[in-house]
Amino acid sequence: AKQSLLSVRGLFININKGVIISWLIAYVVMGAAYGSIYGDMQTFLESNEMMKQMFSHTGFSIEESFTGTVMMVLIGLVSILPIAIVNKLFSEERRLHLSQIYATKVTRSQLYWTSIGLSILSGLLGVLLAAGSLGGTAISAMGNSGEMDIVDFFAAGFNLFPTVLFFIGLAALALGWAPKLGKIVYIYLTFSFLLNYFSGLIDLPEWFLNTAIQSWMPQMPMDDFEASVFLTVTIISIALIVIGFLGYSRRDMNEGA
């Protein structure tokens, strides 16, 4: 066996390598695609009344309004990869691919936390690449007319990182207590994304909007950073991950299920 496969970390990276690389490339491409619009933003929005309604906010430049919404879209996409990595642990378990590992001194704790660690790292990389690609392309497209710099784009992206952690927490909770429900996390992600994306077009009650985790977060650069919200969502996410671990360390393995 390759040296890289002799550790749990190396094995997990190898198992997820293809999907990680594919998604990271997709984030760069999507960021660049949205970023290229910044050079001709006014024309782009005036050509479509619905887009204008979605991306225009009173008191803010078109670029700032657009960035707040587009970053939410990109970070929603970034959340898919960490969920897939956490769910992969169960699919490997179900296919009996982990049987030999269970027979060694490797503990469930190592398997769980390696999977969680890899999902968090992939989420961080995803935000970095998506925000960097969007910002770099946007600044290039705007030239000297732009009011935003690369720091604004990274701040807007990493401000939403707790939502990525929250989806990791939900996937971890499912993995630990009801692993066959892991796919439902994708449904909630889609629901949250659509609710936020179209919230400017549809008049929905506040309580309903707040069922989407993204609604809890300020939309930078239009809104100011809120440390209390950032920490609250992060702590809730960590709690979900820990509760997931308690279930995973106790439940029966679903080998061949």
Regions found by a protein language model. Give the residues of each.
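Transmembrane helix boundary and interhelical loop/hinge segments in multi-pass membrane proteins
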Residues: 83-102
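Secretory targeting signals
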Residues: 114-171, 234
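A structural motif at transmembrane helix-loop-helix junctions in multipass membrane proteins
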Residues: 160-194
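Juxtamembrane inter-helical linkers in multi-pass membrane proteins
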Residues: 1-8, 47-54, 97-108
